[in-house]
Amino acid sequence: MKRWMLVVLIAIALAAVVLFVGFTQIKLDALQEPGHLETVFATQAKHLLVRWSSREGIPPAPANLQASIEEGDKLYGTDCSMCHGPDGHTPTDSGRWMYPRASDLTSFTVQRYSDRELFWIVKNGIRLSGMPAFGKVESDEHIWNLVHYVRTLKGSEHPESGGDTH
């Protein structure tokens, strides 16, 4: 019985600490950058959820990679560059003022996603991040073309980049 009470007291104390840290470190306003704890927690949670969500239901990629990249370049100009910028590294004013700001597509954080995970992100979007879902306006083939084009951006990675915000 004493052991059970100790476990309950520890759980209550831990919950109190988590709530205190949560309420003091996580802000709702978008006037300043999120704190380190919030950024780490949100990024890790997002990566885990994207990995889990992309396990099934992803159609096969187009066979001709070079043609897919060329088509993806065209689509990028109309679908993605308005936020991520023409180079995928320097967001436009719209992308900079999103909260969180548009991701640097050349960053390690974005490029470490698998092709399946990137496909899932482009198709489904990321709720509350500014990343829209293209699944209702673009075909699966077009989404694969965008994924293949984004992969070509990794050669221009900028190490000083913060990287992932979506």
What is the predicted function of each stretch?
Residues 93:
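Winged-helix/helix-turn-helix nucleic-acid-interaction surface
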Residues 84, 151-154:
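Protein kinase-like catalytic domain
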Residues 88, 127, 154-158:
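Activation segment of ePK-like protein kinases, specifically the conserved APE
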Residues 97-151:
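Extracytoplasmic electron-transfer domains, predominantly the class I c-type cytochrome c fold
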Residues 66-89, 118-120, 166:
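Sequence/structural segment immediately N-terminal to covalent heme-attachment motifs in c-type
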Residues 4-70, 135-150, 166:
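Periplasmic c-type cytochrome electron-transfer domains
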Residues 159-166:
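Extracytoplasmic/periplasmic copper-protein system
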